[in-house]
Design a protein with these regions (language model features):
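Flavin (primarily FAD) cofactor-binding/catalytic cores of flavoenzymes
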Residues: 1-238
Length: 238
């Protein structure tokens, strides 16, 4: 059966020998993993996402990030994603050569992310969401050092694995298990994973569409609200 990300009671009721698929590899998925592996004999866990990326760790006792001006190396609008990624990598290398850390670059950039977003065209925003947002998220939204250490220890066991794969289908079986059809990244053929339960940690659905709340649908039909063209909630003026 499928369990919501925050339904810890249902997770706790799973047998100690259960095999569980966690859909997602972000913070919510890590929380679910920690809950499922609290017992002395942890369950067998597979974490799955398109890229198989896990959140990066914070540093222990980092210096407070400096609050500076808009970085000169970024440039002004209109920005292109390819150019911006190249500039960020150059800045990371420059700071690393002088004893800095990639986290310093992102910390300095954090107050200016709204301005960066506004400087991207609609096509470039969609390109970011399609190709780069997974990499941005794991570096921007980091784990506490203690949580990162616990995650690292779990990944060294044979009980936890992370897959970069696409979920194709899910079928129930006569004995109450689930057959998960997936295709790993870079592979042409699909494979089947048999699990006891699935925990959905994909996060909120920000796109406003036919499956949205009735009130939102009605407001859109009445032209009182406009969905974001990027699928990020509502279109706003700034």
């Amino acid at each position: 059966f499928v369990i919501a990300a925050w339904d810890f009671d249902s997770m706790s009721r799973l047998p100690s020998d259960a095999s569980v698929l966690i859909i997602g590899t972000g913070h919510t998925a890590v929380d679910a993993l920690f809950h499922l592996t609290q017992q002395a004999q942890p369950r067998t866990i597979t974490m799955l996402s398109r890229h198989g990326l896990l959140p990066q760790p914070h540093r222990l006792n980092p210096n407070p990030p400096p609050v500076g001006q808009y970085p000169d190396y970024v440039g002004e609008a209109p920005l292109r994603m390819r150019t911006l990624v190249h500039q960020l990598r150059q800045e990371v290398s420059r700071q690393a050569n002088s004893g800095g850390d990639w986290r310093d670059v992102l910390n300095q950039l954090r107050p200016h992310t709204p301005r960066l977003w506004q400087a991207l065209s609609l096509a470039e925003r969609r390109r970011f969401l399609r190709h780069a947002v997974a990499f941005w998220d794991v570096h921007h939204h980091r784990l506490a050092p203690q949580a990162a250490d616990r995650l690292k220890s779990l990944l060294k066991t044979e009980k936890v694995q992370v897959l970069a794969a696409r979920l194709l289908a899910m079928h129930g079986t006569a004995n109450g298990e689930l057959n998960i059809e997936l295709r790993q990244r870079g592979q042409q053929t699909a494979q089947t994973l048999k699990v006891t339960a699935v925990v959905n940690c994909t996060g909120p659905n920000t796109a406003i569409g036919p499956s949205s709340h009735g009130l939102l649908q009605q407001l859109v039909e009445d032209r009182l609200l406009t969905p974001s063209p990027c699928g990020l909630g509502l279109q706003i003026n700034d």
